Design a protein with these regions (language model features):
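Glycine/proline-enriched, intrinsically flexible loops and inter-domain linkers
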Residues: 1-232
Length: 232
């Protein structure tokens, strides 16, 4: 019925057949999580292995630096919320021909060369600041990406299973918010990719793209490596 069904149908079928036995499931899962054995100084330990990807096609099309930066930042956020340390990433993007003259740019669009170079700068800026190794970078050039750019960031994280405490939320629970300061940037961004756009969207929708804060997320990554912090 939707793209999410296509993304999850394989795991559902494997689970139905009883083949997928190491899947970690709970009410809070925000990233694909599997149970693994990890060799730590010659001793097997129970760990959780987390995968997550995020697409920022629309934000990067509108504001390429911030869109690509928060693509990787948002992908990191989800395994991080599972108390894991994200240690590697992959970037796969799609664009039109960046060598075409700027004069051939479609009305209401940024030139492909601008999208390609500025998005690359945004992704690398965030990745370098947070200290994340991106082992695979691949950009696909095809006319089909002229109408809408493709921007995908994928990450892998891991954490000792003993660092994760599973509980269900209940009335009266105290909620602690962690992260950088927020402003009015990003308001409307969640629905921006689903609404109809006009020729002047490029001029008015840039504020819908949130501003990332890699140094703060870097601090959160380090905080959550401490068992006493992530088990609170």
């Amino acid at each position: 019925r939707c793209m999410m069904d296509l993304a999850t149908i394989g795991a559902k079928e494997l689970k139905k057949q009883g083949i997928l036995k190491n899947l970690d499931e709970s009410d809070e899962i925000n990233a694909c999580t599997v149970k693994i054995k990890c060799d730590v100084n010659g001793k097997d330990e129970d760990w959780l292995f987390l995968f997550k990807n995020e697409t920022h096609n629309h934000p990067t099309e509108i504001e390429p630096f911030g869109g690509a930066a928060t693509c990787i930042g948002g992908a990191i956020r989800d395994p991080l919320s599972g108390r894991s340390y994200v240690y590697q990433a992959m970037r796969v993007t799609g664009a039109g021909d960046p060598l075409k003259p700027v004069s051939e740019t479609l009305p209401g669009k940024l030139p492909q060369r601008k999208l390609v170079t500025t998005a690359a700068a945004g992704y690398s800026s965030y990745g370098n600041q947070i200290g994340l190794a991106t082992g695979q970078v691949d950009e696909i050039y095809h006319p089909g990406y002229v109408a809408k750019r493709m921007e995908i960031g994928a990450v892998v994280g891991a954490t000792p299973a003993s660092h994760v405490r599973r509980e269900c939320p209940a009335p009266g629970d105290v909620i602690v918010l962690l992260g950088g300061r927020t402003g009015r940037d990003g308001v409307g961004g969640a629905t921006g990719s689903s609404k109809a756009h006009k020729l002047d969207s490029l001029e008015h929708c840039g504020a819908e793209v949130q501003k990332g804060n890699a140094p703060i997320e870097r601090k959160l990554q380090r905080l959550f490596r401490r068992e006493d912090a992530c088990r609170m």
